[in-house]
Swiss-Prot record:
<dbReference type="InterPro" id="IPR041095">
    <property type="entry name" value="EFG_II"/>
</dbReference>
<comment type="function">
    <text>Catalyzes the GTP-dependent ribosomal translocation step during translation elongation. During this step, the ribosome changes from the pre-translocational (PRE) to the post-translocational (POST) state as the newly formed A-site-bound peptidyl-tRNA and P-site-bound deacylated tRNA move to the P and E sites, respectively. Catalyzes the coordinated movement of the two tRNA molecules, the mRNA and conformational changes in the ribosome.</text>
</comment>
<keyword id="KW-0251">Elongation factor</keyword>
<dbReference type="InterPro" id="IPR020568">
    <property type="entry name" value="Ribosomal_Su5_D2-typ_SF"/>
</dbReference>
<dbReference type="Pfam" id="PF22042">
    <property type="entry name" value="EF-G_D2"/>
</dbReference>
<dbReference type="InterPro" id="IPR000795">
    <property type="entry name" value="T_Tr_GTP-bd_dom"/>
</dbReference>
<feature type="binding site">
    <location>
        <begin position="94"/>
        <end position="98"/>
    </location>
    <ligand>
        <name>GTP</name>
    </ligand>
</feature>
<dbReference type="InterPro" id="IPR047872">
    <property type="entry name" value="EFG_IV"/>
</dbReference>
<dbReference type="GO" id="GO:0032790">
    <property type="term" value="P:ribosome disassembly"/>
</dbReference>
<dbReference type="Pfam" id="PF03764">
    <property type="entry name" value="EFG_IV"/>
</dbReference>
<dbReference type="InterPro" id="IPR004540">
    <property type="entry name" value="Transl_elong_EFG/EF2"/>
</dbReference>
<comment type="similarity">
    <text>Belongs to the TRAFAC class translation factor GTPase superfamily. Classic translation factor GTPase family. EF-G/EF-2 subfamily.</text>
</comment>
<keyword id="KW-0963">Cytoplasm</keyword>
<dbReference type="Pfam" id="PF14492">
    <property type="entry name" value="EFG_III"/>
</dbReference>
<dbReference type="GO" id="GO:0005737">
    <property type="term" value="C:cytoplasm"/>
</dbReference>
<dbReference type="InterPro" id="IPR005517">
    <property type="entry name" value="Transl_elong_EFG/EF2_IV"/>
</dbReference>
<keyword id="KW-0648">Protein biosynthesis</keyword>
């Protein structure tokens, strides 16, 4: 089976939005109109419409699938003639609603070619919009802005356009204006064709009328068309010269120039409408075809050879079926019917059912079993897939989020996702016996989906411990456990994952001797303990010469040392960053054993750690606060009061960026403080950076607490 659609007619895009901007409704409308468009030839319009919506409501499409494939033929008249040679294939990728998870956002941005950014017509650019926008800037993702909810009281399109400029630093380029607002919203003015699109019928927005622009809107339309053309002609010297000579570009040239400016991120086309009132969605879909990139418009992907520690990116993969197969697994989801599904973006080459793939990240082979494409309301089993496609693979055993899959003969690693160690933990207990069974399964599935989340059992208390990257991270996982898996649980207060280490070298000579009649126990060890550089971890070596300790007893010595590492002498936290050498010892022909040397090493290490100046370490977070300038002073003062160290300031667009190191212990509840200090306009991201010694007065308090 050959490729059904040429790569130029693919659009892989996501919908980015602040939490209440109407993402679900917009996605539902897109799926409704594209689905109807797909079946328009064979189903009577009225008959399919309502079933489709009911089915969609039942199945919760926008929630259950990480990527949905659907189809759209660009058209301007409601009663157009379907033509397969004109149809585009849309892969709509679900971008996470919560932007605090850098890992979640980065992995979805890695597979997007373009995006629709939704704004609430009343609220405009909100804090979370700014955060997603910045991350999309970093990944150079072209965007179209859709000012949604224009039917809402207080909706103001022009205020939203100004906010894009002020708050993101990006250049907005309106290509459509709303006709009316609030309950008088009728449709849009298309500034490229200079005509109105008006929706009047009661058919869920399936039909509209194109008509000349009414007199009272003519002046404002001319003004904004002029601004649009000025931005567009900057993309091409010839067009600019012609425009300065009084010649406006024709419609086809104008679309080409707007496309060029969008792809180069010179500006962002802005449109308007109301998904809830079914107005403005079809022109938005046409704009996806006209202005968002196909996989062929995206620069070639550079990867490195598996095992290359320098990660030199010199292996090129571009969107072509003729290149070796390469793909990125970007999301693991559990499907009630199929089991574990690995959502995968194919960057280059082809994949057939039964093929062997190499998981280049892990060095393991996987066989392609079931392959499917997720359509809005069903999954379609496929036999092969091509570059630019987004598919789901069932039953992969070794693959997790962020892994590269490739041709075993031409290996490449596309992405490296390093998942930092968790820095915060909470104890979680099921409320009932029924919850207990469900909780185990829920935690297992959540951990499979999110590599930055860990679950462990506390050996002493038997409690289940959830570990993650921050307070919000764990809050949301607990919420998902409740919503998706119906597990009710009691949650403990968050705890910081402290560590212990040593500050100076020490030598310890310890003898273990026990006589109880019959065979006794005897072992003597002389240990040299030294601190290592932060992050170097633990190492052990034997420097025994002349058989002072026989070889067969040395594993017992190391086992004894390791048994002390899990619980340090100060407050029982894991001990890190030290090395131990066994430099001397003694044994007894009859009374010595592996166990005797293990006991001697354990007791010797306990003494040695105290002698070597044990100290407590705490996780230090790298905190980035993005804030309007007027709040900078109070935010810096607050960070300093939290034992923070401000490393620098920068400007980004019209905002100030504060970069600081702050102990995690002082960041609990920070989000609420920041909101009240900045009237909700400042946002922050936080990630673990390093461990650092705890000041003595605070260390004393922690030791008392855990004694």
């Amino acid at each position: 089976m050959a490729r059904e659609y040429p790569l130029e007619r693919y659009r892989n895009f996501g919908i980015m939005a602040h939490i209440d901007a109407g993402k679900t409704t917009t996605t539902e409308r897109i799926l409704f109109y594209t689905g109807k468009n797909h079946k328009m030839g064979e189903t009577h319009e009225g008959a399919s419409t309502m079933d489709w919506m009911e089915q969609e409501a039942e199945r919760g499409i926008t929630i259950t699938s990480a990527a949905t494939t659907t189809f759209w033929q660009r058209h301007e008249d409601a009663d157009f003639t379907p033509d397969d040679s004109e149809r585009c294939r849309f892969n709509i990728i679900d971008t996470p609603g919560h932007v605090d998870f850098t890992i979640e956002v980065e992995r979805s941005l890695a597979v997007l070619d373009g995006a629709i950014c939704l704004l609430d017509g009343n609220a405009g650019v909100e804090p979370q919009t700014e955060t997603v926008w910045r991350q999309a800037d970093r990944y150079k993702v072209p965007r179209i802005v859709f000012v949604n909810k224009m039917d809402k009281i207080g909706a103001d399109f022009f205020k939203c356009v100004a906010m894009i400029k002020d708050r993101t630093g990006g250049t907005p380029c309106p290509i459509a204006l709303p006709i009316g607002a609030e309950d008088k919203l009728e449709g849009i003015v298309d500034l490229i064709k200079m005509e109105e699109w008006v929706w009047k019928g009661e058919d869920l927005g399936a039909s509209w009328v194109r008509q000349p622009i009414r007199d009272e809107l003519q002046d404002v339309a001319e003004e904004w068309r002029g601004k649009m053309i000025e931005l567009a002609v900057e993309q091409d010297d010839e067009a600019m010269e012609a425009y300065l000579d009084g010649n406006e570009p024709d419609e086809a040239t104008l679309r080409k120039l707007i496309r060029k400016g969008t792809l180069s991120l010179s500006f962002f086309p802005v449109m308007a409408g109301s998904a809830f009132k079914n107005k403005g969605v079809q022109p938005l879909l046409n704009a996806v075809v006209d202005f968002l990139p196909a996989p062929t418009d995206v620069p070639a992907y550079l990867g490195f050879a598996p095992g290359d520690e320098t990660e030199t990116r010199n292996i090129e993969r571009s969107a072509s079926d003729d290149q070796p197969f390469s793909a990125l697994a970007f999301k693991i989801m559990n499907d009630p019917f199929v089991g574990s599904l690995t959502f995968t973006r194919i960057y280059s080459g082809q994949l057939k059912k039964g093929d062997q793939m190499l998981n280049a990240t892990k060095g393991k082979r996987e066989r392609v079993g079931r392959m499917m494409v997720m359509h809005a309301i069903n999954r379609e089993e496929i036999e092969e897939a091509f570059a630019g496609e987004i598919i789901a693979l069932a039953g992969l055993k070794e693959t997790t989020t962020g892994d590269t899959l490739c041709d075993p003969a031409k290996p490449v690693v596309l992405e490296t996702m390093t998942f930092p160690e968790p820095v915060i933990e909470i104890a979680v207990e099921p409320k009932s016996k029924a919850d207990q069974e469900k909780m185990g399964l829920a935690l297992q599935r959540l951990a499979a989906e999110d590599p930055s989340f860990r679950v462990e059992t506390d050996m002493e208390s038997g409690q289940t411990i959830m570990k993650g990257m921050g307070e919000l991270h764990l809050d949301i996982l607990v919420d998902r456990m409740k919503r998706e898996f119906k597990v009710e649980a009691n949650i403990g207060a968050p705890q910081v994952a402290y560590r212990e280490t040593i500050s100076q070298p020490a030598e310890i000579d310890y003898t273990h001797k026990k006589q109880t009649g019959g065979t006794g126990q005897f072992a003597r060890v002389k240990l040299q303990i030294e601190p290592t550089e932060p992050g170097e971890g633990y190492s052990f070596e034997s420097k025994i010469v002349g058989g002072a300790v026989p070889k067969e007893y040395i594993p017992g010595v190391e086992k004894g040392i390791k048994s002390v590492m899990d619980s340090g002498p100060l407050a029982g936290f894991p001990v890190i960053d030290f090395k131990v050498a066994l430099i001397d010892g003694a044994f007894h022909d009859v009374d010595s054993s592996v166990l005797a040397f293990e006991i001697a090493a354990r007791a010797g290490m306990r003494e040695g750690l105290k002698k070597a100046g044990a100290k407590l370490l705490e996780p230090i977070m790298r905190v980035e606060v993005v804030t309007p300038e007027e709040y900078t002073g109070s935010i810096i003062g607050d960070l300093t009061s939290r034992r923070g160290m401000v490393r620098g300031q920068d400007t980004r667009g019209n905002a100030n960026v504060i970069d600081a190191f702050v102990p995690l212990a002082n960041m609990f509840g920070y989000i609420n403080n920041l909101r009240s200090m900045s009237s909700g306009r400042a946002v922050f991201t936080m990630q673990f950076d390093h461990y650092e010694a705890v000041p003595q007065n605070i260390s004393d308090e922690i030791q008392k607490k855990y004694a």
